[in-house]
């Protein structure tokens, strides 16, 4: 009985080693490029997609995010049904007021319907622009590296169009301030 356990343990160890070696080799593609590194988001492409994204205000009127080009901007992907999104809005509004005088724009992108965003904004007024990007906003957030598809998701873009930070989950005001102060 003991020899069967030992034999089984040795088999499992050999199998695990083989899987580990295979996994290590498969993390390199045919060109020898690290697949994990290659999977990093192309942030320049994501920023270009952001500027071209079709968005509307809560009343359904088309808006243009391309007007933000050349300005540092905080983009917050959120939804009315997302508890953490709603909880962080007062902190984002406070930071917006604080950094507006430094020329940093804040924009909320509702991954939601026009109707839900409009009803939400009537109950909870926000002093920075909030647009509706709809459920396609999840694809745009993925382009910025949000592969989990979770909300809230915040992206900081500098005036040159470079992504300076991304955050999945509620923002930490101190953390966001450090990023904004460095712009």
Feature-to-residue mapping (PLM):
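Active-site acidic short loop of glycosyltransferases
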Residues: 68-71, 101, 127
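Hydrophobic beta-strand positions
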Residues: 54-55, 156
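Thiol/disulfide oxidoreductase modules built on the thioredoxin-like
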Residues: 122-128, 133-181
């Amino acid at each position: 009985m003991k020899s069967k356990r030992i034999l089984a343990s040795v088999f499992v160890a050999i199998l695990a080693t083989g899987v580990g070696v295979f996994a290590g080799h498969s993390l390199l593609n045919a060109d020898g490029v690290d697949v994990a590194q290659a999977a990093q988001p192309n942030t320049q492409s994501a920023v270009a997609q952001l500027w071209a994204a079709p968005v509307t205000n809560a009343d359904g009127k088309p808006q243009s995010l391309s007007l933000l080009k050349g300005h540092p901007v905080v983009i917050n992907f959120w939804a009315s049904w997302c508890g953490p999104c709603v909880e962080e809005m007062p902190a984002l509004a406070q930071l917006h007021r604080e950094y507006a005088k430094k020329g940093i724009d804040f924009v909320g992108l509702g991954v939601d319907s026009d109707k839900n965003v409009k009803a939400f904004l009537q109950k909870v007024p926000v002093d920075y622009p909030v647009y509706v990007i709809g459920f396609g906003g999840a694809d745009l957030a993925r382009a910025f590296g949000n592969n989990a598809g979770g909300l809230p998701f915040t992206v900081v873009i500098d005036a040159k169009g470079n992504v300076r930070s991304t955050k999945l989950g509620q923002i930490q005001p101190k953390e966001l301030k450090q990023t904004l102060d460095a712009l």
